[in-house]
């Protein structure tokens, strides 16, 4: 259980509670979660050691045009890691559902409403794209870059989070490389539902021991935090124990409620080169 799972800032969330589904536009449904909750635990100050965004894909975005004809789209939202808040996912889903029976004059009006409401909730300007299904169908399904570390023949008996599994993980050899794993699994901070993801780690520094890294990632299996918080924890732990010169951590989680979340944290750039989905998304 997270150290801050009982924080008062989480008490009013709709997550884990029975809720009604509104079908008329209602921006008040959005609920923020202060990023400071886990960043205080990670001892992160105002000067963050990373750049980045939380990239959301909205697969269930629909509204009515001015004549009442339903429209469907796939949305992409980029929320800066520097924003005061992350957006709680169930509230995001409920908010998007509120578009379903609401008439809008144009796709651009929908995009601008999303920008305004999500920026207000996050506490900083967000970027939004609203794409046609035809456009999205033309996008590729990709895999992560670099070496997959999942096929190691090792025994694991503990699934409790332990950052000390990274102790001594940095070797002597200096490398520039990319590693990835599809075995990332954590649990929702509130509901304990499983969150399934893949994570890509790109770095320049002393070569990271594959076994230690895999054991560390598997230790998230019974850990309770939101997606964004897990990625920041991975980033800060790798910086603490391995001290790379440069580091990028990019996780892509499977969708729930028509949404997937893809947190990106990097010393090098604020956004990934692309937002193509993976096979499990």
From Swiss-Prot:
Belongs to the GTP cyclohydrolase I family. QueF type 2 subfamily. It is an enzyme of class 1 (oxidoreductase). It comes from Vibrio vulnificus (strain CMCP6). It catalyses: 7-aminomethyl-7-carbaguanine + 2 NADP(+) = 7-cyano-7-deazaguanine + 2 NADPH + 3 H(+). This is NADPH-dependent 7-cyano-7-deazaguanine reductase. Catalyzes the NADPH-dependent reduction of 7-cyano-7-deazaguanine (preQ0) to 7-aminomethyl-7-deazaguanine (preQ1). InterPro entries: GTP-CH-I_C/QueF, NADPH_dep_7-cyano-7-deazaG_red, QueF, QueF_N, QueF_type2. Its EC number is 1.7.1.13. It is found in: Cytoplasm. It holds the Pfam family QueF_N. Homodimer. Pathway: tRNA modification; tRNA-queuosine biosynthesis. GO terms for biological process: queuosine biosynthetic process; tRNA modification. NADPH binds at residues 89-90, 256-257.
């Amino acid at each position: 259980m997270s150290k801050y799972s009982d924080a008062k800032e989480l008490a009013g969330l709709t997550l884990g509670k029975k809720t009604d589904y509104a079908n008329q536009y209602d921006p008040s449904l959005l609920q923020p979660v202060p990023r400071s909750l886990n960043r205080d635990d990670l001892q992160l100050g105002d000067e963050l050691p990373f750049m980045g965004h939380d990239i959301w894909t909205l697969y269930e975005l629909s509204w009515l045009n001015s004549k009442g004809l339903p429209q469907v789209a796939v949305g992409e939202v980029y929320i800066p890691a520097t924003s005061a808040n992350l957006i709680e996912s169930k509230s995001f889903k409920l908010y998007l559902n509120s578009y379903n029976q609401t008439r809008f004059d144009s796709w651009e009006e929908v995009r601008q409403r999303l920008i305004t409401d999500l920026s207000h909730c996050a506490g900083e300007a967000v970027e939004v794209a609203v794409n046609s299904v035809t456009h999205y169908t033309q996008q590729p399904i990709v895999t992560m870059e670099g070496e997959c570390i999942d096929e190691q023949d090792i025994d694991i008996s503990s699934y409790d989070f332990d950052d000390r599994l990274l102790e001594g993980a940095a070797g002597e050899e200096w490398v520039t490389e990319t590693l990835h794993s599809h075995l990332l699994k954590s649990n929702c901070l509130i509901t304990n539902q499983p969150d399934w993801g893949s994570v890509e780690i790109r770095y320049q520094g002393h070569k990271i021991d594959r076994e230690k890294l895999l054991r560390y990632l598997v230790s998230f299996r019974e850990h309770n935090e939101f997606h964004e918080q897990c990625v920041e924890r991975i980033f800060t732990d790798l910086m603490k124990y391995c001290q790379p010169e440069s580091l990028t951590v990019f996780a892509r989680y499977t969708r729930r409620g028509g949404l997937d979340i893809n947190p990106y944290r990097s010393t090098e750039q604020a956004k990934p080169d692309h937002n193509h989905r993976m096979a499990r998304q």
